[in-house]
């Protein structure tokens, strides 16, 4: 099973794409966002639930549900600070969160907007 961490403009379409072939858990810390997605509402208009036949996708903000997964794809934002340096706070927080539930053999992938260097 696959966990997509962060359901913004990168994570949500990725979760939907993977859910066409695999069981996927879409995780976000924003409980309002999870509630909207569970009610088939996407205020960002990244996906159109009417056009999607999504059956293998569960939206959650409960980290415990992700223990079932063995692939974790982190897609959280990496904004630029006032010095034009990437703010890695979201990336670090997401990493520390899933580190608590990782098992031997699990795979973590960073699909981030951070620039190289």
Residue map of PLM features:
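Structural/interface elements that position substrates and couple domains in central-metabolism enzymes
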Residues: 1-117
